[in-house]
């Protein structure tokens, strides 16, 4: 009998976690078609995380970021301030409610590590109106973005973390196009995972 297991190559594509964090927003479906398979950007593989309570979601996403395979997180929410697809460039140290600081020792502001300019360009190339802004919104997206960024190790090779806000009245087709464009732009900056060391 021929052993084919030696011919199976490990998947060295880095993982990009995509999370639409608003429970009532069903416009982003990571399943590509009737095959039931997840959509993957070129050069990366998608890990879909479903919406939950913000504190639980922050814990889940931070666990993913501690895994060697996870090289990016794309949060997906709604833009209630304009009709554009918007990349949020930073998040403030602010609790979900009450206006207090989320963490006493964290920086006042944390900047997104995702390639914002390339993501905006990719959205434009997809035929979508898009921009980038330092202004956040008082929602779970701002909280999650800061929570993830504040917990990153001080490392030059930090994972790419970004927040895409889609227009509030976008169609599901437009949202899918926007998420795919933004995730694809992130994936182009990711390197294949290193080969596993055999001891």
Model-derived segments and spans:
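Polyanion-binding loop/helix "lid" in catalytic or ligand-binding cores
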Residues: 141
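Active-site-adjacent mobile loop/cap segments within catalytic or ligand-binding domains
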Residues: 145-192
């Amino acid at each position: 009998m021929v052993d084919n297991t030696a011919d199976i190559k490990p998947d060295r594509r880095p993982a990009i976690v995509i999370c639409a964090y608003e429970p009532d927003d069903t416009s982003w479906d990571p399943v590509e078609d009737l095959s039931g398979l997840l959509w993957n950007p070129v050069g990366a593989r998608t890990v879909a995380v479903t919406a939950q309570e913000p504190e639980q979601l922050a814990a889940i996403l931070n666990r993913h970021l501690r895994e060697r395979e996870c090289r990016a997180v794309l949060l997906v929410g709604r833009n209630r301030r304009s009709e554009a697809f918007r990349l949020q460039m930073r998040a403030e140290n602010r609790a979900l409610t009450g206006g207090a600081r989320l963490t006493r020792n964290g920086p006042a502001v944390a900047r997104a590590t995702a390639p914002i300019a390339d993501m905006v360009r990719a959205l434009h190339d997809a035929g979508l109106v898009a921009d980038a802004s330092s202004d956040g919104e008082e929602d779970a997206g701002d909280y999650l973005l800061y929570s993830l960024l504040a917990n990153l190790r001080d490392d030059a090779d930090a994972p790419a973390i970004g927040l895409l806000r889609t227009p509030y009245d976008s169609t599901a087709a437009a949202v899918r196009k926007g998420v795919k464009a933004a995730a694809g732009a992130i994936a182009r900056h990711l390197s294949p995972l290193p080969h596993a060391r055999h001891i």
